[in-house]
C-alpha cells in the first residue's frame, strides 16, 4: 500500500470518528430533552387528572386505526370493589394526598435501588421522604377510626365496635334457650323449666306445654 493510500484511509477513519462523536452528542441531547418533556407531561397529568380521559380517547382512536393495543389509562377516581370484607383504601384522601403518597413510594424505590449500588439519596430527598412518611402515617391514623355520624354519634364516644363496626343491641330479640345461663332450660342442673307466668306444678308432677296435666 502506498503512502497516499494510507493517508486517505486515515483521513476517512478520522471523518467517520468525528461523525460518530457528533451523532452521539446529538443523541445525548435528544435523550435529555425527551426526559425533560416526559417529566413535564407526567407533572401535567398528575395535576390535571381529567387529561387521562383525553389520553384514553387518543389511544382508543389509535387502536381503531389499526395500531398496537395500548395500556389502559390510569384511573384517578376510586375503584369500587364489591368483594365482601374489603374496604377502599382511598377513603378520605384528596388528590394531593394521593400524589404525595405516590411520591413517597417513588423515593423509597429510588432509595432501595441506590442502596444496592452503595449510594444514598441526597439530603433534600431524604428530608422529603421523612416528611412524606410522617404525613402518610398521620393520614392512616386519621382514616383508621370510625366515621362520624351514621352509627356513631357526632358527639360523645362511638357506639359501635372498635374500628367503626356496629354491634346492634339485642333488646327485644328472643334469646336461644340453649345459650342462656339465667332463668331458662336447666342446662346445668341448677334451674327448672321457665314457666313465664304459669304456676309451677307441685313437686313430683311434670307439665309439658300442649299436653293435659295428668
Swiss-Prot record:
- MF terms in GO: RNA binding
Q: Where in the cell is it found?
A: Virion; Host nucleus, Host nucleolus
Question: Where are residues bearing Omega-N-methylated arginine located in the sequence?
Answer: 13
Segments for region (Dimerization): 12-59
What keywords appear on the UniProt entry? Acetylation, Host nucleus, Lipoprotein, Methylation, Phosphoprotein, Prenylation, RNA-binding, Viral penetration into host nucleus, Virion, Virus entry into host cell
Lipidation positions, renumbered (S-farnesyl cysteine): 211
Give residue numbers for the modification (Phosphoserine): 2, 122, 176
Pfam families, alphabetized: HDV_ag
Q: Where does motif Nuclear localization signal map?
A: 65-74
Domain (HDAg) ranges: 20-194
Q: Which residues carry this modification: N6-acetyllysine?
A: 71
Disordered: where is this region?
43-185
GO BP term (any one):
viral penetration into host nucleus
| Spans annotated as RNA-binding | 96-106, 135-145
- Per the record, which residues fall in region RNAPII-binding? 129-194
Family stated for the protein in its record: Belongs to the hepatitis delta antigen family.
Query: What job does the chain carry out?
Result: Following virus entry into host cell, provides nuclear import of HDV RNPs thanks to its nuclear localization signal. Needs co-infection with hepatitis B virus to provide surface proteins, otherwise there is no packaging or budding. Packages the HDV ribonucleoprotein in hepatitis B virus empty particles. Interacts with both HDV genomic RNA and cytoplasmic tail of HBsAg. May inhibit viral RNA replication.
**Protein's UniProt name:** Large delta antigen
User: Which organism does this record belong to?
Assistant: Hepatitis delta virus genotype III (isolate VnzD8349)
Amino acid at each position: 500500500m502506498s503512502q497516499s493510500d494510507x493517508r486517505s484511509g486515515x483521513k476517512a477513519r478520522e471523518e467517520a470518528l468525528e461523525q460518530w462523536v457528533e451523532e452521539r452528542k446529538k443523541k445525548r441531547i435528544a435523550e435529555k430533552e425527551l426526559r425533560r418533556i416526559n417529566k413535564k407531561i407526567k407533572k401535567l397529568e398528575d395535576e390535571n387528572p381529567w387529561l387521562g380521559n383525553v389520553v384514553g380517547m387518543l389511544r382508543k382512536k389509535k387502536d381503531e386505526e389499526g395500531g398496537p393495543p395500548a395500556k389502559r389509562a390510569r384511573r384517578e377516581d376510586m375503584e369500587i370493589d364489591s368483594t365482601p370484607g374489603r374496604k377502599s383504601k382511598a377513603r378520605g384522601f384528596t388528590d394531593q394526598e394521593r400524589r404525595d403518597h405516590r411520591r413517597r413510594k417513588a423515593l423509597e424505590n429510588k432509595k432501595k435501588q441506590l442502596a444496592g449500588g452503595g449510594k444514598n439519596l441526597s439530603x433534600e430527598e431524604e428530608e422529603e421522604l421523612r416528611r412524606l412518611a410522617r404525613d402518610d402515617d398521620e393520614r392512616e391514623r386519621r382514616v383508621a377510626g370510625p366515621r362520624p355520624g351514621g352509627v356513631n354519634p357526632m358527639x360523645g364516644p362511638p357506639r359501635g365496635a372498635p374500628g367503626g363496626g356496629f354491634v346492634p343491641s339485642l333488646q327485644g330479640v328472643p334469646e336461644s334457650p340453649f345459650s342462656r345461663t339465667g332463668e331458662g332450660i336447666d342446662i346445668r342442673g341448677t334451674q327448672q323449666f321457665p314457666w313465664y307466668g304459669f304456676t309451677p306444678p307441685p313437686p313430683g308432677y311434670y307439665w309439658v306445654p300442649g299436653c293435659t296435666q295428668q
